[in-house]
């Protein structure tokens, strides 16, 4: 299947500059193509992942992806989709962010073989361009009226836009022209808000490389959820690729909780499952939605892809333990992942009567309530029901000598660590 046909059935194409030309080009040649990301933060979130998934599909089809990390453009900030001016970051912070993104993106692509990916930083070819060179060699090629008409600028004219952000599209166009000239890059991929920046690059290539220069642009639709909320966010905020910001367990849970109305769309966008495999899962959503086979597949595929097989196994283990209540088999690391958002208490490293211990920590409001809950079998320590009012809490009640998991009733969890 032609990669363009595959992207179309996946619903992953919003706009392209020359469909017939690009389709023919990718059928007949191995092409280089790129997608960029600015280091505005130290981690990608799953919304950033969308265009890079397209880039990876091109690699799977035998083409060469170029991943551009914007060490230069990141110092300015892309005005696309922003209602107000970005705050500029220090060069030191941007450099740190660049390295963090390099690590994350390095896990997504193959860097060996005939279709090996490459990673570039636009700071390398931008840092020595003087202001006079910029104005003479590049600024001269851009018509201000055309720049003002592009959505990325027009949407900001009422509230105002600095020359810095106004000039962003010139810098991004310089990137495409540079990669065309030195890396034989023929295609730029981006989100739907990048159309103006991409077409600016194509115009510059034609002016610098000649009217017969073959280059293309392709954008991806804005991904929306069936309930109208923004994709990529949970109640706790953005879903990050950095495991220190969003644990693999939380990452897995985000996908497993996907709405039935969205899951088939996400399978097409984010996984490498075939059309037949996705069609089969779509049927199960219709006939056996309670089994959540599509969500389980989506969560497993994404956790493996972004993290690892080991991280998936860990997420499944935590999920199973929380569902069954058998938490004793969890490691300290797994407990930190699975109980990240539950009320947490710090206890003295001493022995104590269970009832007193629950009240001292604040898990129970009073001794009377604590005795009642223990006596009724409503208190569980590390998954085991406790009904002995005289029980002494000691080191044997700690997992890896670090944590005690308390459950009150069926679902109310508390995590206790020790001084």
Swiss-Prot record:
L-tyrosine binds at residues 34, 168, 172. ATP binds at residue 233. InterPro entries: aa-tRNA-synth_I_CS, aa-tRNA-synth_Ic, Rossmann-like_a/b/a_fold, S4_RNA-bd, S4_RNA-bd_sf, SYY-like_C, Tyr-tRNA-ligase, Tyr-tRNA-ligase_bac-type. Keywords: Aminoacyl-tRNA synthetase, ATP-binding, Cytoplasm, Ligase, Nucleotide-binding, Protein biosynthesis, RNA-binding. Pfam families: SYY_C-terminal (PF22421), tRNA-synt_1b (PF00579). Its EC number is 6.1.1.1. Residues 352-418 form the S4 RNA-binding domain. It is an enzyme of class 6 (ligase). A motif ('HIGH' region) lies at residues 39-48. It catalyses: tRNA(Tyr) + L-tyrosine + ATP = L-tyrosyl-tRNA(Tyr) + AMP + diphosphate + H(+). GO terms for biological process: tyrosyl-tRNA aminoacylation. GO terms for molecular function: ATP binding; RNA binding; tyrosine-tRNA ligase activity. One of its GO terms (cellular component) is cytosol. Belongs to the class-I aminoacyl-tRNA synthetase family. TyrS type 1 subfamily. PANTHER family: TYROSINE--TRNA LIGASE, MITOCHONDRIAL, TYROSYL-TRNA SYNTHETASE. This is Tyrosine--tRNA ligase. It comes from Listeria monocytogenes serotype 4b (strain CLIP80459).
């Amino acid at each position: 299947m032609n990669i363009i046909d595959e992207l179309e059935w996946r619903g992953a194409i919003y706009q392209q500059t020359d469909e017939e030309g690009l389709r023919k080009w990718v059928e007949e040649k191995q092409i280089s193509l790129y997608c960029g990301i600015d280091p505005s933060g130290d981690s990608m979130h799953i919304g950033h992942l969308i265009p890079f998934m397209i880039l990876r599909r091109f690699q799977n089809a035998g083409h060469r992806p170029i991943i551009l990390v914007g060490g230069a453009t990141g110092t300015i900030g892309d005005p696309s989709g922003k209602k107000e001016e970005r705050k500029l970051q220090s060069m030191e912070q941007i450099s740190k962010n660049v390295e963090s993104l390099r690590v994350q993106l390095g896990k997504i692509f193959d860097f060996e073989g005939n279709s090996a990916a490459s990673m570039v930083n636009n700071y390398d070819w931008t840092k020595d361009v003087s202001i006079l060179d910029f104005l003479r060699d590049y600024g001269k090629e851009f018509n201000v009226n055309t720049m003002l008409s592009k959505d990325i600028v027009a949407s900001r004219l009422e509230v105002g836009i600095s020359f810095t952000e106004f000039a962003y599209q010139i810098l991004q166009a310089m990137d495409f022209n540079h990669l065309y000239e030195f890396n034989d890059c023929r295609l730029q991929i981006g989100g739907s808000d990048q159309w103006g920046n991409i077409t600016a690059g194509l115009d510059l290539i034609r002016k610098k490389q000649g009217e017969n220069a073959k280059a293309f642009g392709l954008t991806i639709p804005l991904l929306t959820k069936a309930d109208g909320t923004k994709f990529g966010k949970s109640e706790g905020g953005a879903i990050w690729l950095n495991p220190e910001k969003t644990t693999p367990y939380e990452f897995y849970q985000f996908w497993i909780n996907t709405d039935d109305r969205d899951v088939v769309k996400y399978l097409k966008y984010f996984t490498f499952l075939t059309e037949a495999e996705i069609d089969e899962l779509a049927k199960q959503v219709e006939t056996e939605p309670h089994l959540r086979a599509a969500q389980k597949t989506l969560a497993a595929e994404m956790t493996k892809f972004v993290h690892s097989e080991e991280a998936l196994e860990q997420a499944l283990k935590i999920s199973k333990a929380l569902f069954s209540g058998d938490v004793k088999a969890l490691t300290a690391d797994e407990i930190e992942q699975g109980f990240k958002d539950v009320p947490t208490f710090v206890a003295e490293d001493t022995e104590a009567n269970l009832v007193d211990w629950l009240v001292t920590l604040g898990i129970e409001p009073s001794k009377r309530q604590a005795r009642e809950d223990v006596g009724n079998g409503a208190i569980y320590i590390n998954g085991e029901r406790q009904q002995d009012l005289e029980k002494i809490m000691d080191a044997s009640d700690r997992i890896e000598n670090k944590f005690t998991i308390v459950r009150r009733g069926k679902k109310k969890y508390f995590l206790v660590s020790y001084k």
